[in-house]
Amino acid sequence: MVRIAVDAMGGDFGPYPIIEGTILALKENPNFKAILVGHKEKIQTLIPHKYNNRIEIVHAEDVIRMDEAATEALKRKESSIYKAVELVRTGEAEGVVSAGHSGATMSLATLRIGRLKNVSRPAIATLMPTYKNKKSLVLDVGANVDCKPEHLFEFGVMGEAYATAIMNVDKPKVGLLSNGEEETKGNELTKNAFTMLKSLPTFIGNVEGNNIFDGSVDVIVCDGFTGNIVLKTSEGVADAISKLMKANIKKTPIRMAGALMMKKVFRSLKKEIDYSEYGGAPLIGVKGCTIISHGKSTPKAIKNAIYQAITYIKSDINTKIEKRLEEVTPKG
């Protein structure tokens, strides 16, 4: 049975949505055990008795707040995220899910659990909607602000493995995010990364921002600085469009009537762009499984983050990443 450690105290709204999301996951999936890490008394009051045999509680006195430095994480051994990560390091859990301090989670997972063989920098990967009824994968979206060409090469290989193992894409197309499709476009980093990525049979060359959403490419590679801006901009645009639509619909009764007739369409669209449908973003390149969830995660988002962790673990993707990197990494 898969064991998932959940940072019960992380997140903007305290333990309630985290624990409620864990219980939702347990209701729907009987094939995993949850280890909730945090203040024992607070957690116990939120757990129905019938789930006691499927939930273990590991007490943690401390919580790393969102406004604290990520460098604090390694010193705070009594914090909920530190203890949750340690459960993976010691083999007591196969994966960890946290909606807490993302920098602390990344640092602890990288330094305490450790990186996979031939991985120099783990990357955060996120799924993006496209209008071709499939998803695209973007990495890195925030783990590494400054990158070297070899890091982007590794991201391409890891993204390729993820698309094959998790997204079930037979021959994923890997693209490098740049300011133009031509090989001569980009900065020094992307030009040098392009040269390295050309050795991958799945590499299709440079892609532009619009290609993230048009379904023409499965894996989009970029540094964490660029990727995080892409992610936050996408979230902002989706939110702005939603609010603009609501404001314009309310202007006339006819529009409101038309909106009611399109309720199913709007519901389907919301599902495509709602972060809670994805649950979280995997930190690819570390041992075990680390899922980083949004601080504002709802119970539904936590439930889906746990499911994402289970899928990640069962896919044996880490073995596939190590094998693929061994095959394609230049020797010497």
Swiss-Prot record:
Chief location category: cytoplasm
Family: Belongs to the PlsX family.
Subunit structure: Homodimer. Probably interacts with PlsY.
Subcellular location: Cytoplasm
GO terms for MF: phosphate:acyl-[acyl carrier protein] acyltransferase activity
Protein name: Phosphate acyltransferase
EC number in record: 2.3.1.274
Protein purpose: Catalyzes the reversible formation of acyl-phosphate (acyl-PO(4)) from acyl-[acyl-carrier-protein] (acyl-ACP). This enzyme utilizes acyl-ACP as fatty acyl donor, but not acyl-CoA.
BP terms from Gene Ontology: fatty acid biosynthetic process; phospholipid biosynthetic process
EC class of the enzyme, as a word: transferase
Pfam families reported in the protein's UniProt record: FA_synthesis
Pathway(s): Lipid metabolism; phospholipid metabolism
Keyword RNA-binding on entry: no
